[in-house]
Structure formats: C-alpha cells, structure tokens
C-alpha cells in the first residue's frame, strides 16, 4: 500500500519517467490518459485525503501498476507494498534499472516460446523477488521513518517521540500494516497455498469472467521504451497480460475500468476518513485491532489476492457489471480484491477474529459471517458471552474496547500505528529545541500538551503517586521551614526592638501577589494552602466532630473567620499607609467598635468570675509601644492589635478586689453629660512636629467608677451598672496624640470619649507600677461638645430636666428617630459601652499577635480572634456558682444619633423611678449620657461641687483653643468615695497636683501619676477652668480609690489632657464592659424603635405602650425583695447584629443560669422562680428550665464555621449536650421527675399517668414501669404491655404474676409449669409463699394447727370451685374451667394467689387478735398483703364463704388466716357439697370496718350505704396499691349472713376503678379489658 507521497516519490521514479517518455516518445493514448488521470487523482488525493497511515485498511496495489513495466518490480510490489510505504529514494536507481533490464531480457528470450504453465512462471518470478524483497522491505521502512513523519504526526494528537523507539512488534501492528512478507520463512507457506489453489483450479472463478479482456498496455518506467519497438512492446505486454494475470488479478484494462475500481475501493476503504477522519478514529476506537496473529497470514492472503488469478483467454469479453472475484469455497463474488482477500482469509484460518485481541469493522466480512453462520453464535473471546448476530457482538466488543482504551491511557501507548522515528531523526526534522521531555521516564514530546497528558499517567501510578506524594511532602516541609525562618526573624526583631512583630494583613496580600507562597497552613495536619478559602474547606474535615471533645486540638487549628465577618471587614478595610524600616505595611485603625466588643467580651467573662485570666489578645484597644525616647515623637498607632505584654487593669467588685462579685461600671458618656460644657467650640489642635496621630475612632474611655452600692451592707457585691451608648461625635474632630513611654517599654493609652476628655479608663496595666519613669503621653481628640443636659444644676436629681440639643443635632435626631433602639435590659446584665467610631486619621505600625489566652492560638486579625473566642464562650458554664450574679453580655447598637422620640421616654422613666423609689433609668440621648438615679436613702443628698474623674477638660494641646467652662452637674454621691478609694491605691509621688478643692486636685486638671498637670511640656494652652456642680458624695471615694491604684511617676505629661490617669492594678477594670457596633452594623440593625421596660425587660415598639405598661408596675411591688435586692443593674441593649453573628444567649437568669435571647423571655422565666410552691422540687434552683420553651436564635456562626459546631447546650446535672433548648427542657423535666420518685416512698410503684407518663415515653433514660412477666420486656404504658401480650404471647402459657387481676384469664388453663413453694416443716408444696408463711405459723404439728390447715384446705377448695361457677354463668366452657380440688396440683393452686390477696386490710380482728398478721401484710410498701405475686385484688370468687369451713372452726379461731368470711365477691355462691351442713355453722356477730373513715358497722346493709358515700372517691382512686381488691371495703370476720352481705357489697375493677354490685358484673366488665 502506498501513500500519495510514495507515488510522487517512487523509487522507480515512475512519474518522472512517464513525463519524460511522454515528451520524447509518447505512450499509447489509453495508457497515457490513464496515467494522466491517475496523476491528477493522486494529486487531488494528496490534498484532500488523509495520510495513508490513517487508513484503517490496506490499499490494493492496482493503483500503482500503471506506472510499472512488466519487470521485476511489478511482481515485487504486490508482496511488499502492504508492509512499507514504498519510499525508495534511498535505493540506487542504477541497480534497480539493471534488475529490471535483466528481467526484461528473460522475457525477450521467452518471447517466441509457447507460454509455460503459469505456476512455473509464478514460482520463478517469486524466487527472483526474494532477492530483492527483504532488502526492499528494510529500505522501505527506513525511508518511511525519515520522510513520512509529516503525515505520521497527524495520526495522533500527541505523538510519542521517545529516544530510540523500537519498531513496533509484529503482533501489535494493525491489520493494514501487516501482510508483507518480511519474514523469508513465510514465503514458502504462501506459495504452497498458492500452488494448491492454482493446481486445483487453474482457471479459478475469481477471474473467470475476465478471460476475454484485452491485455492492458502499460508504459515502461525507464528509457528503454524508446529502444523497443511498438509491436514488440505490445506483444510482451499481451504475453505478460496472459501469463501474469494471476499475479495482477485480471485488472487494469483501461482508464475507465481502473478509475471505477479505484473509486469502489476508496469508497469502501476510506469511509472512516469521511466520518472519523481516519487515523484519529483509528487511534482512538480501533487501537485493539489485531486481526492477524501472524504476519504470514496476511502475506498469504495478499499473495492469494494478487497472484492466484488464473490466466484468461484473449477471446473472452469483459463484463464490467459482474463481480470479477469469486470465492472457490463458498461461491461469493466480490468486485474489490481487498474484500475478496479479507474473505479468503476467513477460509484460510480457523479462527479469524481473535476477539480477545481485535475486531475488524468490515462490511464484507460481516456479510460473510451472516451467510456462513446460519444458526451459529458469535462468542466474545474475552468474557465468553455469545451473540446470535455479529452486530450485537460488535456492540459488545465496544465495551471491551473502551476498557482497553482506559488501560492504554494508564501506560505508554506501545501499539502505535506505525514505527515512530527515533529521537535523533525527529531532532533532525524539527530541531533540537522543539521537544518536551518527561522527567520521569525521559520520554520526549513534540507538544507541551502531549507532555501534560503523558504526565497524568505517572500521576495515576502507585510508584508515581508515592513520588508525587514525596514531592508534595517536600514542598510542605520547605514551606514550613520558610515560615519557621520568618518566625525566627520576627523573634529577633522583637528582641531587638523590644516589641512583638507580626506581619499585617496587607503584607499577606503582598506575599500573595508577588511570592505566591502557600501561606495558609493548617495547624492540625500541616498542609499549606495558597488561598484562605481552600484552608476553610480543608478545616471542615477536622471540625466535623464535637468541638467540645476536641477542645485542645481545636484551639490549635487556624481559625477561619466566617463569611459575614469577612464582608463586614470589607466595609472598613484598613488602609495601607507606609513602610518603616523595611517592615510590614502599616494600617489605619479599624472601627473602635471592634475594640470595644473585645473589651466587652473580656469583661463579660471576668465579671462572671471565670478563674482564667482574660485573654490579652481580646483587649479592645491596645497600642504598640511608643518610642523609648519620650522626646522622639515618631508616629505610631493606637492599634487594634493587642500587645502581648500589655494588660488591662481589671476592676473587680467596685475596685474592692473581691473576685466573682459584680462590678460597678459606669458608661462612657455618663459623667461627661453631667459635666459637659455648655458651649464649646470646635477644637483645633496644633499639629505635632512629627505628626503624632491617632484614629478618630479611638475614644477616651472615662475612668470606670464604681457607683457605691445602694445597699450599704454589701460592699460592692452587686454592680450598679449604668450604661448609655455614647452619641456620635461631630464630624469635625482632629486628633493630637503624643504618647510617651516609660523605660520599661509599657505604654498607657487613654481613648478619648466622644464628647469630653475628662473621664478616662486606663486601657493598660502598668507592668512597672513602682517605676518612676512611667510617663504616658495620651492622645487627645478634640471634639465639639454639646451642652450638658443632665448636669447643669444641682437639682438635676430632683427634677430631671432635659435640655434640648442644638438645632442641627435635633434635626438629625428627628431624621433618625425611627432607627434607634432602646435596647432590652436584663436585671442582671452588665454594661456594654457603645463607643462609636469616627474617621481614620492616621495609621501606624503595629506589631502584635492576636493571641487567645485560653488556648494560645494566635491570629493575624482581631476579627478572627473574636470569632475564635466565641468557641470558648459557648463552652463556659452559664450557671456557675463561682459568682453571685451572672453577668450577661449585651452589646448596645451604638447608633451615633439617638432617637429624638426617646426624650419623652427618658423623662417619663425618671418620673416613674422617682415615684417608686427606684433607680432612674438609663437612656440613650445625645446630650444626656447618664442619669444616676439614687436609692431613697441618698436620693436627696447632693454632693459638693467637685467632679472627680468626670471633668471635661477644655484645654487643647499647644494652646490653640481656650479652655471651656465646665458646669459640673449632680453626680451620684457614691461616686466620690469610690474615686477617693481608687486614688488612695495609687502610688503617689511628691509632684504637686494642681489646685483642686476636693482631693487636692485642681479643677480641670486631674492628677495623673502625680504629674503637675498645669505644667505641660507644650504648655501654650491655658488649662480650662471647670465650674463644679453638685456631685454625689459617694463618687469621690471611688474616684480616689481608682486614682490610688494608678502608679504615679515624676515625669510630667507632655500633651496629656488633664484628668488622665495611669493604669492601676488589674482589678480596676476587671468587669469594665465596653462594646460598640460599627456604623455599618448600626445601619443594618436600625429599624423600628423598641422601648424596653426597665423593671421587667419587656420591649415595646410604641412609647405609649411602654408608659401604659409601666403603670402596672406602679400598682404592684416586687415579689421577692430578697431576690431582686441586688438586681439594680440596668441591662444594656443587645444588638441584633451581635445576636446574629455570635449566636449567644445574652440574657441569663441569675438564679438558675438559664440564658435567653430576649429580656422578655427572661422576665417570664423569672416569674417562675417567684412561685416557689409550684417548683419546690430539689435542684430546681440549679437546673430549672423555663416553662415556655425557649427557641434560641440559630447560631449563624456555627453554620458558617464548623469549628464551633456541636451541642452548645449542656445539662448542668449530667453534662449531656443538646442542640436545642427544647430538648434540654424535656431532659430537665426527667431529672425533676426522677427526683420526685426518689423522694417518694412508693417510687417503685408510682405510675405517672397522663402528661407525666407521656413525658416519660419521650426519653430512653427513664424507667420502664410495666414489665412482662413472661419475657421480662418492659413497657411505658399498660396498653403497650397488653398489646405485647396479645401479639407476642398469644399462644404462650400464662404465668400469673403480681399483675394478674382478671378472672377472664382463668378461661384458659395454665400451659406452663409454675414453681412450687415447699414447707420445710412438713415437706408439702404450695403455689404461693404466703401459704408457707401461714403454714409456718399454723403448722399441723403445732397447737391448733390442724384446724387451721383444714380451714386453709377448705378455703383453697372454695377458691377453686367458685371461679367454675362464675365461668359457667358467663357461658364459658365448663371443661376448660373444670376446677381441681387438690391443692398440690398447679392448676388448682394457681387460683390461690389471686384469691388470697382479696383482703386489703386483712380479716376482722378476732378475739385472739390474730388478724393483725394479715392486716400488717396489707401495709407493706407495695400495698400487698404479703403475697409476692400481688394478685390481691382478684375479683373472681375470692369472697365466697364455705359454710363447712366455718363450722369446723372453733370460736377462738374464728378469724381465718385467709379471711374468707368477709369476702365480698361471690359470697352468694355456695358450695353444693356444703349446703347440707349449714345448720352446724356457728356464727359470730359480723362487723364491718370502713377504711376511709374508720367507722364500724354491724350490718352489711349499713356498711353498703356508707360505702356509697365514698363511691366517687373509690371510682376515681388510682390503682396504685396492687393487692387490694375492693380498695376500701372491710370484710366481716365471720360467715354469718354471708349471702345477704354480698348483695350490699361493691366490687371494684382494678384497671379502671369502677364499682360493681355483684361479682358477675365485675367479671363481665373485666372481660372488656382483656379482650
């Protein structure tokens, strides 16, 4: 088979020869026309048809014969054309010409001879071909590798071009590449078959129709054409046409026939090219085509197809319409020789299609299979499945083909279509720079995409997986080492600079942009990620478990903030400012509300008394250490990142240092409102030399003053928390912050308040309290301050008047009147100070880790730490007893502009509280920041005109603004002692403070570290003079105490505002709770105004509704003054944003620890505690669950962050976790019910009915009260037990246990052996152990024992006979209920337990008092008469008296042990055998004792009438005392008048408690229960 390249570049140069012969001596027209047409067709095919190597079938060599003469190459081509591309340019042309010429000479010698046998000719020609065949095949392969690359490159998208590729093995070559006799040993086989075929039929039918064809004339391929005469040439052609027809197959008669043949052949052979584009399809879907296991088979087939045609006669005419090729074995005709060859192969091989190896899509072969198969089935060689049609097999084979292709993709494609050229050859063709080499297997590729595809193979292999895994592990190790080196460098910088160093978030962005390192590493498994989102997804693997079980490990994981937090961070993305000393990018301060939220969380837990110190990284406003040189005013930032070394001073219990007690906290703007200046202009600070800046969002925290406890007997145990969200600062505010640092490296920062600068809260604890160099330069933010509304006069306490704010502020308030909350306030909630943030003025370096103090986890962002700490928040026990009152964190949405409509509410609240003697409410007002409502004993007590720690200093740095006058309003009296106390704890130096009337402090200058406040370094600004208003007296001691805790230093403050105080001990701010919500959060949360009642915490949307509601409180007093004595704390508002993000329950009951998301729910819950008579159960105070099922807000953080997922609600008694509080409610009810049962004496028999029983069914831990006596299975209800008996034990024998009560069960005989009780004295056996106990007392061997035994035997006989009579009345089968008199038999004695237990109170006392024994038996805990089986209330025949038995008893033994004399049931039924002996019965006067009222009746009629009065009680009495048949009926001790007594007695059903007059009615009724 030849390509178009092969034809154009033939070894024989046929085209060139033809063109030259056409110019010099033109060939005959048919030949020339044929050749021209073929040339044109070949050129067109070279452009339009895919390369030859893409053809799925072998080409017929007929298309090459017009170029050839009747020379040796003519015979060689059919044999070798199919196995090479016939690129023979490398052969020597002269040698081939000589071979052709010598062969022509041989032909000329035979010219005059008679044509010999064609077999001999063929044999001779074939031998001559052998001399050239092998060499030509090798040369052809070589020429193909060197020149056929262009077409081969198209056969696969990514050809493999590895070095030194070996030729493809013969077994793996596709069908169209095999069939050429490359092996010399196979030639003989081919020729033998050929000779046999010709010998069998010299004129084979495959060309019998073509004998009359004229011999075709072919041009010579060389110049000998000119030397030969025309007649000679024609005769030779004719002769060779006859003689060589067997080799040529009788084709190529003229141009039209050749064209038609080629068209037919192309139509069949190239149908893949038109559909699947040839080689691409062949490579993908026909990879497994290996139809010939041996190349000799194909060579044999091709030899047959081309050489076996017999010669045809010259006289035969040409029939173009007939099929020229006829199979000798089956007679099938073919028009194309290739189809005929393929068909012949089927006959020459037993098993053509090795379906385990390949499958050939051949229409002709399929046709043959259909014709030959008949009923034959087609079998798949791989799986053995058979098919009746080849099409089904073909479809089935496609499945295996796909599997094979999948396997081939996992390994290098060794079954290439054609032998690939060597690497050196490809380099010669394409150049040495255009190859891609696989580093694993050293294989090269022309395209990078091919290399990528190839490398996937190595990725799927096990060894390659290990290599890749090792490579990835090396990458991780390198990343870890790199991070470790970075951490080491950071530690070195810390040691050099004295402060921790951390890359800021912006620097991480730089690393992402420029380095593309894997900077996100999982702390659990060490895997690194380039993006945070990838790390989040990865961490879900580690956090799917319970976070409380993996607490220690969870804390080591990198915290992943939630998506909502990310979105919020984008709203106030920190700005990049500058680099300093090649350090990290500096960022501006983010919102101070985030700082305050950290602070509030810290105080939330510290106030609750958790022993663990507050996490330093949670501290709200931290600062990087300023330059050590106090004169070096380099810019630095009051950063959000906390300094690990700096700590908050912790204020505990009003600065008393008492742990776990409530703190006294004042809100930020409380005292400032009382001392706010009347008309201050805007401050314009003078710029500092080196632009010391601070973010305007940072705010001065006023010093936390512990308002004296209103209850003087308790020293600050209960915090008096006043809170007001500070109003938004006006837009014009500038900052001057110049902070000096002490030598110890500790810095103190005071965040200025929104309006005033006077009050301060120390934000750091001075680690070096005794240091004399503890100078702090505190930033001061000047802001326009509105006039004070609450502290203008001394009488603000009496008639709290509210000044109207300025017009501009009022207009803004009106605009936002509907967008402000008066947040719900719990009685026990701590203050969260809302600190609105302003504009970012400057950003400076910060170098701090945000580290969680609890688990040691460090974070690069504060927000991540906040989200992380929510995990610890949920793990903390909410009901801990380490603190007296629970501190509930609540965050006020510090919307800067408070609702204008709330002013009326504030006034109303003040009036109400003054009227009721309660503390005045706190309110959110722009001008009124806090009202200190005092208790009745100090409500009228004014303070002197001093304001300590609350003064607003109007002094601006550098004297650019004159000091404003500060009118001091009334402040609570308890603030002064606290102020003094705080000052008293400060180590004082001998530097003079200014001149101040109280505490020796100048007005407008607060002593801070004993610095002369009047002598500031930049003292070009006069100190503001503050007119002092009346201040409560109790404020001064607290103020002094706070000052006393502050370490004083000898250095003067540079630009520090007056009134600033250094950081005291950590106790000072132990429970200082501050929080704020950013403006974005406030905008989101702003909605309709909610007004909350300060008494009960109930919220209202309308102010009028709140006013009306508060009138109800004026008409009632607190239920429990003890309980609310310390509930003077006004809860702060809870921001909806905090609820949504944190998912925490913010309102907690101080008594039981239950948390609620709204104060109204807490109010409803606290009402329950007031009803002690309803909830007096043990442990109610510890683990009470609200009656109203609380539906906690769904934790959004848990949904977004699986690290905090799990059961966050736990039972405080057993520690069991629950997802929802409703489940905990049910669980706690079980605890209460269990405690009730433990306290009850009859807890084992108490059957909780109704709702209580249904609650028991809801839990698996509760006791199952109904037990099956047969199989021991327990059930919650009697109905379930009955259904169990009906379904499971329907056909099983009944074992009458303690719960047997119904007479209907006696209808079925016992089918199970019942254990007997043997008497040790006499050896007799009894069914019931009570009989043995009585027998031990009344043993026959003892005195009087024989009579008792006889009476007992008669009693048993009566008990067995009576049910028979009853069952007869009911219509039951007498045979089934036939009584057995013998007491020793189980069937007879089975009725004994049921009968004997009928007496609840025993028999009536006889003369000898023996009735005490049964009576005592009835009083056993189980309510049974000493019978363990408990069938005491058996209704059937228990009370039927035996007259004969009574007659035999002596008078002193009138009382029978079993007490059958007064049995009510069945008394009217007499034993027939005993009727004749009634006259002998000696009867004693009967009496009846009522169990209810202890009355005694002589007649049964009177007793019956008396019982009717108790009928209602008897009917509804719960059946909680098994063993009592009629419950309240006393039987007579004698048998006199037994028949008459039965009429007046009542029989009670033990199932439902219904009473009946006769036993028959009771038996019928009980049948309804038993079905």
From Swiss-Prot:
Residues 770-781, 799-808 have a biased composition (Polar residues). Residues 1-120, 137-241, 456-495, 585-649, 672-713, 764-820, 937-1070, 1373-1487 are annotated as: Disordered. PROSITE patterns: ZINC_FINGER_C2H2_1 (PS00028), ZINC_FINGER_C2H2_2 (PS50157). One of its GO terms (biological process) is regulation of gene expression. A zinc finger (C2H2-type) spans 325-347, 378-400, 436-458, 520-542, 850-872, 1091-1113, 1147-1169, 1209-1231, 1266-1289, 1317-1339, 1488-1510, 1547-1569. Sequence repeats lie at residues 942-946, 967-971, 987-991, 992-996, 997-1001, 1002-1006, 1007-1011, 1012-1016, 1017-1021, 1022-1026, 1027-1031, 1032-1036, 1047-1051. Residues 199-265 are annotated as: 3 X 5 AA repeat of P-H-D-D-K. GO terms for cellular component: autophagosome; nucleus. Residues 35-56, 80-99, 169-186, 193-215, 223-241, 592-614, 809-820, 940-1070 have a biased composition (Basic and acidic residues). One of its GO terms (molecular function) is zinc ion binding. Residues 199-265 are annotated as: 10 X 5 AA repeat of P-H-X-X-E. Residues 1377-1397, 1405-1418, 1431-1485 have a biased composition (Acidic residues). It comes from the Eukaryota. It is found in: Nucleus; Cytoplasm. Its main location: nucleus. Induction: Induced during p53/TP53 mediated apoptosis. Up-regulated by DNA damage in cortical neurons in the presence of p53/TP53. Brain, glial cells, neurons, skeletal muscle, uterus and placenta. In the placenta it is found in all trophoblast cells. Keywords: Apoptosis, Cytoplasm, Metal-binding, Nucleus, Repeat, Zinc, Zinc-finger. Induces apoptosis in cooperation with SIAH1A. Acts as a mediator between p53/TP53 and BAX in a neuronal death pathway that is activated by DNA damage. Acts synergistically with TRAF2 and inhibits TNF induced apoptosis through activation of NF-kappa-B. Plays a role in regulating maternal behavior and offspring growth. Homodimer. Interacts with SIAH1A and SIAH2. Interacts with TRAF2. The SCAN domain enables PEG3 homo- or heterodimerization to control gene expression in a combinatorial fashion. Belongs to the krueppel C2H2-type zinc-finger protein family. This is Paternally-expressed gene 3 protein.
């Amino acid at each position: 088979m030849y390509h178009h390249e092969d034809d154009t570049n033939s070894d024989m140069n046929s085209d060139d020869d033809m063109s030259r012969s056409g110019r010099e001596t033109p060939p005959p027209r048919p030949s020339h026309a044929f050749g021209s047409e073929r040339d044109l067709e070949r050129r067109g095919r070279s452009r339009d048809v895919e390369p030859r190597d893409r053809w799925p079938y072998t080409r017929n060599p007929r298309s090459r014969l017009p170029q050839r003469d009747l020379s040796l190459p003519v015979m060689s081509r059919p044999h070798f054309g199919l196995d090479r591309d016939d690129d023979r340019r490398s052969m020597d042309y002269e040698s081939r010409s000589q071979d052709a010429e010598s062969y022509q000479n041989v032909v000329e010698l035979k010219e005059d001879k008679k044509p010999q046998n064609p077999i001999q000719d063929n044999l001779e020609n074939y031998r001559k071909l052998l001399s050239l065949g092998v060499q030509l095949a090798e040369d052809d392969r070589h020429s193909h590798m060197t020149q056929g690359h262009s077409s081969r490159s198209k056969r696969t998208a990514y050809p493999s071009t590895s070095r030194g590729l070996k030729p493809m093995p013969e077994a793996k070559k596709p069908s169209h590449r095999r069939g050429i006799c490359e092996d010399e040993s196979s030639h003989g086989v081919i020729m033998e078959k050929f000779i046999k075929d010709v010998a069998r039929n010299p004129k084979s039918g495959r060309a019998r129709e073509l004998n009359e064809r004229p011999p075709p004339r072919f041009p010579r391929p060389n110049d000998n054409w000119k030397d030969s005469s025309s007649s000679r040439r024609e005769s030779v052609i004719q002769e060779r046409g006859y003689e060589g027809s067997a080799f040529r197959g009788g084709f190529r008669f003229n141009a039209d026939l050749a064209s038609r043949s080629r068209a037919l052949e192309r139509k069949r052979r190239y149908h893949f090219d038109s559909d699947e584009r040839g080689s691409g399809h062949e490579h993908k879907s026909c990879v497994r085509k290996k139809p010939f296991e041996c190349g000799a088979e194909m060579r044999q087939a091709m030899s047959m197809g081309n050489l076996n045609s017999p010669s045809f006669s010259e006289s035969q005419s040409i029939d173009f319409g007939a099929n020229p090729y006829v199979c000798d074995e089956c007679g099938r005709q073919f028009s194309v020789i290739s189809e005929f060859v393929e068909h012949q192969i089927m006959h020459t091989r037993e098993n053509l299609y090795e379906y385990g190896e390949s499958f050939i899509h051949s229409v002709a072969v399929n046709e043959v299979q259909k014709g030959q198969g008949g009923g034959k089935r087609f079998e798949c060689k791989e799986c053995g499945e058979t098919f009746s049609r080849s099409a089904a097999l073909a479809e089935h084979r496609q499945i295996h083909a796909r599997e094979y292709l999948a396997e081939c993709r996992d390994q290098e494609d060794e079954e290439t279509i054609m032998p690939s050229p060597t690497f050196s050859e490809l380099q010669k063709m394409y150049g040495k720079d255009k190859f891609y080499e696989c580093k694993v297997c050293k294989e090269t590729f022309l395209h990078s995409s091919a290399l990528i595809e190839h490398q996937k193979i190595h990725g799927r292999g096990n060894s390659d997986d290990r290599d890749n895994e090792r490579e990835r592990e090396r990458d991780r190790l390198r990343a870890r080492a790199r991070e470790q080196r970075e951490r080491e460098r950071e530690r070195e910088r810390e040691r050099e600079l004295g402060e921790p160093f951390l890359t800021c978030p912006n620097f991480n962005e730089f690393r992402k942009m420029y380095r593309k390192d894997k900077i996100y590493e999982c702390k659990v498994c060490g895997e690194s990620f380039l993006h945070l989102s990838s790390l989040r997804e990865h961490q879900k693997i580690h956090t799917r478990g319970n976070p409380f079980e993996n607490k220690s490990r969870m804390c080591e994981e990198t915290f992943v903030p939630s998506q909502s937090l990310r979105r919020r961070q984008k709203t106030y993305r920190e700005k990049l400012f500058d680099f300093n000393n090649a350090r990290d990018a500096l960022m501006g301060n983010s919102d101070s509300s985030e700082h305050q939220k950290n602070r509030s969380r810290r105080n939330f837990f510290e106030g609750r008394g958790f022993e663990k110190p507050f996490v330093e990284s949670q501290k709200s406003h931290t600062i990087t250490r300023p330059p050590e040189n106090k004169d070096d005013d380099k810019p630095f930032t009051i950063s959000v990142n906390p300094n690990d070394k700096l700590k908050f001073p912790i204020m505990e219990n009003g600065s008393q240092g008492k742990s776990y007690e409530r703190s006294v906290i004042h809100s930020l703007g409380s005292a400032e409102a009382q001392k706010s200046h009347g008309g201050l202009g805007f401050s314009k600070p003078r710029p500092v030399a080196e632009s010391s800046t601070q973010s305007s969002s940072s705010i001065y925290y006023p010093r936390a003053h512990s308002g004296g406890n209103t209850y003087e007997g308790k020293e600050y145990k209960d915090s008096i928390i006043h809170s007001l969200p500070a109003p938004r600062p006006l837009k014009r505010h500038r900052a001057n912050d110049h902070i000096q640092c002490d030598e110890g490296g500790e810095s103190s920062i005071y965040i200025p308040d929104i309006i005033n600068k006077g009050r301060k809260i120390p934000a750091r604890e001075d680690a070096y309290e005794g240091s004399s160099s503890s100078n702090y330069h505190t930033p001061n933010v000047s802001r326009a301050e509105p006039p004070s509304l609450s502290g203008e006069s001394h009488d603000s306490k009496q008639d709290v008047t509210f000044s109207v704010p300025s017009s501009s502020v009022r207009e803004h308030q009106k605009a936002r009147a509907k967008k402000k909350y008066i947040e719900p306030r719990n009685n026990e909630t701590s203050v969260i100070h809302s600190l609105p943030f302003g504009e970012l003025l400057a950003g400076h370096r910060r170098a701090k880790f945000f580290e969680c103090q609890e688990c040691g986890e460090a974070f690069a962002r504060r927000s991540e730490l906040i989200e992380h700490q929510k995990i610890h928040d949920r793990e903390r026990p909410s009901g801990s007893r380490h603190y007296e009152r629970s501190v509930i964190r609540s965050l006020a949405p510090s919307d800067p502009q408070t609702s204008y409509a709330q002013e009326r509410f504030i006034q109303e609240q003040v009036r109400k509280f003054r009227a009721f003697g309660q503390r005045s409410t706190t309110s959110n007002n722009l001008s009124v920041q806090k009202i200190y409502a005092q208790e009745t004993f100090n409500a009228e007590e004014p303070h002197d005109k001093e304001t300590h720690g609350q003064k607003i200093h109007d002094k601006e740095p550098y004297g650019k603004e004159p000091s404003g006058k500060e009118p001091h309003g009334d402040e609570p009296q308890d603030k002064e002692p606290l102020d003094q106390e705080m000052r008293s704890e400060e180590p004082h130096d001998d530097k003079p403070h200014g001149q101040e009337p109280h505490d020796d402090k100048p007005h407008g200058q607060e002593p801070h570290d004993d610095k002369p406040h009047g002598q500031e370094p930049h003292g070009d600004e006069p100190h503001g003079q503050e007119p002092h208003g009346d201040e409560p007296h109790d404020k001064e001691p607290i103020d002094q105490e706070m000052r006393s805790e502050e370490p004083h230093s000898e250095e003067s403050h540079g630009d520090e505002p007056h009134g600033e105080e250094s950081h005291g001990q950590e106790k000072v701010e132990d429970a200082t709770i501050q929080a704020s919500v950013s403006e974005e959060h406030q905008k989101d949360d702003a909605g309709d105004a909610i007004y909350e009642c300060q008494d009960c915490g109930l919220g209202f949307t309308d102010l009028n509704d709140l006013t009306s509601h508060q009138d109800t409180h004026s008409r009632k007093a607190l239920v429990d003054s003890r309980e609310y004595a310390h509930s003077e704390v006004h809860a702060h508002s809870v921001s909806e944003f905090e609820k949504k993000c944190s998912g925490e329950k913010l309102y907690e009951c101080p008594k039981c620890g239950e948390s609620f998301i709204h104060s109204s729910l807490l109010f409803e819950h606290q009402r329950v505690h007031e009803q002690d008579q309803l909830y007096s159960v043990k442990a109610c105070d510890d683990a009470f669950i609200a009656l109203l099922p609380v539906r906690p807000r769904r934790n959004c953080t848990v949904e977004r962050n699986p690290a905090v997922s799990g059961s966050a609600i736990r039972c405080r008694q057993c520690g069991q976790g629950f997802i929802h509080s409703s489940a905990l409610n049910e669980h706690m009810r079980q605890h209460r019910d269990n405690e009730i049962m433990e306290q009850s004496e009859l807890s084992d028999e108490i059957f909780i009915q109704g709702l209580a029983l249904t609650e028991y069914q809801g839990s698996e831990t509760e006791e199952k009260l109904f037990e099956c006596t047969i199989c021991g299975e327990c059930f919650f209800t009697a109905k379930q037990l009955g259904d169990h008996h009906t379904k499971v034990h329907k056909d099983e024998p009944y074992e009458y246990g303690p719960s047997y009560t119904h007479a209907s069960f006696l209808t079925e005989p016992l089918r199970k052996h019942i254990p007997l009780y043997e008497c040790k004295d006499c050896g007799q056996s009894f069914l019931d152990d009570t009989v043995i106990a009585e027998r031990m007392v009344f043993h026959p061997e003892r005195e009087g024992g024989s009579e008792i035994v006889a009476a007992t035997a008669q009693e048993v006989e009566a008990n067995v006979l009576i049910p028979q009579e009853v069952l007869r009345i009911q219509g039951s089968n007498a045979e089934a209920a036939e009584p057995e008199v013998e007491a020793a038999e189980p069937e007879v004695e089975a009725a004994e337990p049921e009968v004997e237990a009928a007496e609840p109170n025993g028999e009536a006392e006889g003369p000898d008092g023996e009735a005490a024994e049964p009576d005592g038996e009835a009083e056993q805990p189980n309510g049974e008469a000493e019978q363990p089986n408990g069938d005491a209330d058996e209704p059937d025949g228990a009370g039927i008296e035996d007259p004969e038995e009574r007659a035999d008893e002596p008078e002193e033994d009138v009382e029978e042990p079993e007490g059958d004399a007064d049995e009510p049931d069945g008394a009217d039924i007499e034993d027939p055998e005993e009727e004749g002996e009634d006259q002998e019965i000696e009867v004693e006067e009967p009496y009846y004792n009522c169990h209810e009222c202890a009355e005694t009746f002589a007649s049964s009629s009177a007793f019956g009438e008396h019982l009717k009065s108790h009928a209602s009680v008897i009917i509804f009495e719960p059946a909680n005392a098994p063993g009592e048949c009629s419950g309240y009926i006393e039987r007579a001790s004698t048998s006199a008048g037994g028949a008459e007594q039965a009429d007046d007695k009542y029989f009670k059903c033990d199932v439902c408690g219904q009473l009946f007059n006769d036993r028959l009615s009771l038996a019928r009724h009980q049948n309804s229960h038993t079905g």
